[in-house]
Amino acid sequence: MPTSPWVTLAHIVRPQGRRGEVIAELLTDFPEKFAERRHVFLTRDAASDAAPREMELAGYRLAQNRVVLHFAGIDSIDAAEMLRGLDVVIPESERAPLDQDAAYISDLIGCDVWDEAAGQRVGIVQDVDRQASHVDLLVVDCENGQRAEIPFVKAFLVKLDTTGKRITMRLPEGLLEINASTATAREPRARRTRKRGLRKPITGADATPPDSQ
């Protein structure tokens, strides 16, 4: 799965007011990035070959989970309307370096999960659930057609290779069957394209998971 050299800070939803401002959905855990920058880039699709358009950031203000942006040269509602649906992105190279065993969520999406104990591929990471448990859960579409949720904990993690898109784990016997049943019983997740948002990194937790026997 090819990766984009860009990460997304926000997605422009619509014009805001009549002075050329736009309101955008935040896709970053680091909104202070807007205060640090004079320029950002706009694109319809960060994964495409088309070069994003560089824009001067004239102002911003936060509004709950959204941000109001004003770009230099965009001074009317008609001009702002032309920006509807665009993503606000920055180069991937501007992300902060990570500690060992930590990863940005966007880099985990699309990784193959391998079970070292069983010597086989489990499936591919489709999402990361940070809400349902005291540890982060890798949401994996398994080879057998089921969906499983695997705790991203150091007790299970053998090797994390986001460059090679591979996560090697040592999973307790029966864990996949139990967690696949739990995941299937929940409401189905909406299928959507995950943008490479600039999110806080997650680290394999130190917490020892409950005994799976």
UniProtKB/Swiss-Prot annotation:
The PRC barrel domain binds ribosomal protein uS19. GO terms for biological process: ribosomal small subunit biogenesis; rRNA processing. Its main location: cytoplasm. It holds the Pfam family RimM. It is found in: Cytoplasm. Signal peptide: none annotated. It comes from the Bacteria. One of its GO terms (molecular function) is ribosome binding. InterPro entries: PRC_barrel-like_sf, PRC_RimM, RimM, RimM_N, RimM_N_sf, Transl_B-barrel_sf. An accessory protein needed during the final step in the assembly of 30S ribosomal subunit, possibly for assembly of the head region. Essential for efficient processing of 16S rRNA. May be needed both before and after RbfA during the maturation of 16S rRNA. It has affinity for free ribosomal 30S subunits but not for 70S ribosomes. Residues 189-199 have a biased composition (Basic residues). Residues 99-175 form the PRC barrel domain. GO terms for cellular component: cytoplasm; ribosome. PANTHER family: RIBOSOME MATURATION FACTOR RIMM. Keywords: Chaperone, Cytoplasm, Ribosome biogenesis, rRNA processing. This is Ribosome maturation factor RimM.
